[in-house]
Amino acid sequence: MVDHNLLQRKKLFLFDLDGTLYLGDRLFPGVRELLSCIRARGGQYRFLTNNSSRSVEAYVQKLTRLGVAAESGDFLTSVDALIHYLREHGGEDRRYYVCGTESMKSQLRAAGFTVAERREDANALLMGFDTELTFQKLEDACILLGQGIPYLATNPDWVCPTAYGFVPDCGSVCEMLWRATSRRPIVIGKPKPLMLSLIHISEPTRPLYIS
């Protein structure tokens, strides 16, 4: 049941993706109708996700395939927030070893950051939701953390929901590294305030966040 009074009062709606609008390739019932109702009543919606494994372009393609109207400007990911944080804190001169997907690496390179493929060339470590994770990456991360280099993570989530259940997310891997190295990262994504603050920069209103 859609609460039309709530839709009328609110003008900006922020939606999480995995496990909120869809699970795997299955869109939840009522999602299309809800989003259409928001737009029809003069509201706007944006999509926020901690999932760093995909690019915005991949998310646009997925939602379009599921029948949801979406453009690249409708999205904010934890990689977007990470890039903003690195720029604000003088991170352009560092060389980053990335425990993340090739998509995450490509986004960082496109933003002007140096991604080191070898740990010997790195002087900072970035952790994401790495669906391409290998034991070699974990070993490299432990060695780098032992050297005391800066350490950041896209998000604190323990698990990511999938069509077949839950899988370990970035937070679980960071916990494993903490057990091995006693190092904890600076965490960027939700529920940290940075991502929402980036939305407020361009949307000066009180949104309704649905996760």
Language model: regions and residue ranges:
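Single conserved hydrophobic/aromatic residue that forms the stacking wall/gate
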Residues: 200-211
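Short acidic low-complexity segments
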Residues: 4-5, 112-123
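Substrate-recognition element of Asp-dependent hydrolases with the DxDx(T/V) motif
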Residues: 15, 35-61, 75, 94-101, ...
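Conserved acidic, metal-coordinating active-site core of Asp-based
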Residues: 120-199
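Substrate-recognition/cap helix-loop segment adjacent to the acidic, metal-dependent catalytic center
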Residues: 39, 55-74, 111, 147, ...
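Short, charged N-terminal beta->alpha structural module
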Residues: 88-111
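Asp-based phosphoryl-transfer active-site loop
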Residues: 9-27
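A short, structured active-site edge motif that brings together acidic residues
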Residues: 71-81, 119-122, 156
